[in-house]
């Protein structure tokens, strides 16, 4: 009987010890089951490349970049800021790091609904004002990949991931596995705005 538990136990251990270790891992009783699924997906996607070109629907976002930027500039001043520290215990209180949900941007919301690979649950414009560090972290599940396209760069700003680094420059897009290590270091004084979309693998 114990031998039957060995494989799922090893799968959970593998997921738990990914860097950075999530100190909240076992506070959620369902997290070990998520860990087993994560390890299974890691085996399936071993050595697979995270690339925007693998998701043709995302070309619509790039193609309409100017319209998306114009709509953001027109609409966001009318909206209330939503703070990341209010929705996740991982984030320290920081009133310079906030977001706007894309459901409040009619043109973009309509566009995203035309792209089947996008999961809209966390779709948002993420805004960071001034210098900032988001320390190494990772998502609970690897079911989704994370897509970024930069609306405003806001000065020197680099996202570091297991597969390399990405500069947040206006109009640049990037996709990565956010269940793996990533951190953000922003030394620029300006406002960085990034459209964040989750993509089904």
Task: Outline where the language-model segments fall.
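Non-heme Fe(II)/2-oxoglutarate
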Residues: 2-115
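Short, conserved beta-strand element in jelly-roll/cupin
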Residues: 127-129, 140-157
């Amino acid at each position: 009987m114990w031998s039957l538990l060995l494989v799922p136990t090893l799968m959970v251990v593998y997921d738990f010890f990914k860097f950075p270790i999530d100190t909240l891992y076992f506070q959620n009783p369902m997290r070990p089951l998520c860990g087993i699924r994560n390890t299974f997906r890691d085996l399936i996607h071993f050595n697979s490349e995270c690339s925007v070109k693998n998701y043709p629907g995302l070309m619509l976002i790039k193609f309409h970049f100017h319209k998306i930027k114009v709509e953001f500039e027109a609409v966001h001043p009318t909206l209330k800021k939503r703070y990341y520290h209010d929705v996740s215990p991982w984030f320290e209180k920081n009133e310079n790091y906030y977001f706007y949900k894309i459901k409040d941007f009619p043109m973009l919301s309509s566009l995203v609904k035309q792209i089947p690979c996008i999961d809209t649950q966390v779709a948002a414009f993420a805004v960071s004002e001034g210098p900032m560090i988001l320390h190494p972290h990772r998502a609970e599940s690897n079911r989704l990949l994370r897509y970024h396209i930069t609306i405003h760069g806001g000065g020197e700003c680099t996202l570091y991931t297991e597969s390399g680094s990405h500069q947040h420059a206006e109009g640049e897009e990037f996709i990565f596995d956010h269940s793996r290590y990533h951190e953000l270091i922003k030394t620029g004084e300006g406002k960085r705005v990034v459209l964040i979309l989750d993509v089904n693998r």
